[in-house]
Amino acid sequence: MPKINILNQQGDFVSEKVLATTVFDIKPNQQVLYDVVNAQRAAMRQGTHATKTRALVAGGGKKPWRQKGTGRARHGSIRSPLWRGGGVTFGPSPRDYSVKVNQKVRSLALKSALSLQAKNNQLVVVDNINLATHKTKDFQQMLQKLNITSKSLIVVTQMTEQLALASRNLSYITLETASHASVYQILNCKQLVLTAAAVNYFEEVLK
């Protein structure tokens, strides 16, 4: 069974925890990871893009000139896609990009992502994260003691106002609760920082 050291906010060793093999030590399913990440990224899209077809552009109800006898090409509307100011052919319209993903697939993807980060030694477990102030400087000092200097995802079980304020000005830090952490977020970081409570949450939910 995999083991990991639990550190305090000063970066000192506190204890050792045995991680659940069914959550942090499975063989990552690459296809499931691909499918779920694609679905999660698709769900982020607004899908509000829109263009007007010839039916939606104002005007153009009158035939510009008669069909025959003028010597010019025949036209039925000045809003044809051939005309300047006309409609767009096969342009984008508002749509929902979200894709349904089954619960079992989502769970497997989450376990695969956690296992991948654990196997790559990119998992850091902290006993707890409590900040006395909301200052970014104090939070950054704590990160330096934990040797967290690259793009990281910090997962806690409960979001506090001080933690949210202290972390929001650091571009390389993403803060998320365990119940909302996505597979895409977990894979899209160099270091995954979990509190001990977050580890217990994942083991309980994904067992």
Swiss-Prot record:
The keyword NADP does not apply. GO terms for cellular component: ribonucleoprotein complex; ribosome. GO terms for biological process: translation. Residues 63-77 have a biased composition (Basic residues). It comes from the Bacteria. Pfam families: Ribosomal_L4. Residues 57-78 are annotated as: Disordered. Keywords: Ribonucleoprotein, Ribosomal protein, RNA-binding, rRNA-binding. GO terms for molecular function: rRNA binding; structural constituent of ribosome. The keyword rRNA-binding applies. Part of the 50S ribosomal subunit. Belongs to the universal ribosomal protein uL4 family. HAMAP family: Ribosomal_uL4_B. One of the primary rRNA binding proteins, this protein initially binds near the 5'-end of the 23S rRNA. It is important during the early stages of 50S assembly. It makes multiple contacts with different domains of the 23S rRNA in the assembled 50S subunit and ribosome. Forms part of the polypeptide exit tunnel. This is Large ribosomal subunit protein uL4. The gene is rplD.
